[in-house]
Amino acid sequence: MENLCIKDILQILPHRYPMLLIDKVETVEPGKKIVAYKNVTFNEGFFRGHFPHEPVMPGVLIIEALAQAGAIAVLSLDEFKGKIPYFAGINKAKFRKKVIPGDTLKLEVEMIKLRGSAGIGKGIAKVNEKVVAEAEIMFMIG
């Protein structure tokens, strides 16, 4: 599947404003990998307090964006359509650079394990092809 717009994303993910952190999907191989994007704007509510004079996207929200991208890849499988993805854990999270208003986050997630309704995805977030964050995300599908 390629080039999913926001209408397509809303049919796959259960997340809605203000927690929907995916704007576009470039490509997805169901159950295997995905490349998605989040456009970061100054209008994001979290910038009011993080930080008022130097807005920086919270690292936990970058991880959440990676998790949502990975969820699209898994929820695109027929057996998981319409289900809810839940965080089960995070390993090896690293934050390398700040993400600020005007940035476009490129979210790449590859499933490294998928057994039954649980799995692990390796996520890498980039801005201008430079790694800004990475993590292994464990999840369960309910």
From Swiss-Prot:
Biological processes per GO annotation: fatty acid biosynthetic process; lipid A biosynthetic process
Query: What InterPro entries does this protein map onto?
Result: FabA_FabZ (IPR013114), FabZ (IPR010084), HotDog_dom_sf (IPR029069)
- Keyword Endoplasmic reticulum listed? The answer is no
Question: Which keywords belong to this entry?
Answer: Cytoplasm, Lipid A biosynthesis, Lipid biosynthesis, Lipid metabolism, Lyase
> Catalyses which reaction?
a (3R)-hydroxyacyl-[ACP] = a (2E)-enoyl-[ACP] + H2O
Give compartment(s).
Cytoplasm
Instruction: Cite the EC number.
Output: 4.2.1.59
Q: Which gene encodes it?
A: fabZ
HAMAP family attached here? FabZ
The GO terms this record gives for MF are: (3R)-hydroxyacyl-[acyl-carrier-protein] dehydratase activity
The function of this protein is: Involved in unsaturated fatty acids biosynthesis. Catalyzes the dehydration of short chain beta-hydroxyacyl-ACPs and long chain saturated and unsaturated beta-hydroxyacyl-ACPs.
Q: Which Pfam families match?
A: FabA
**Which class of enzymes does this protein belong to?**
lyase
Any keyword Lyase?
yes
Q: Which cysteines share a disulfide bond? A: none
Q: Which family does it belong to?
A: Belongs to the thioester dehydratase family. FabZ subfamily.
> What name does UniProt use for this protein?
3-hydroxyacyl-[acyl-carrier-protein] dehydratase FabZ
Q: Any idea which residues are catalytic in this one?
A: H50
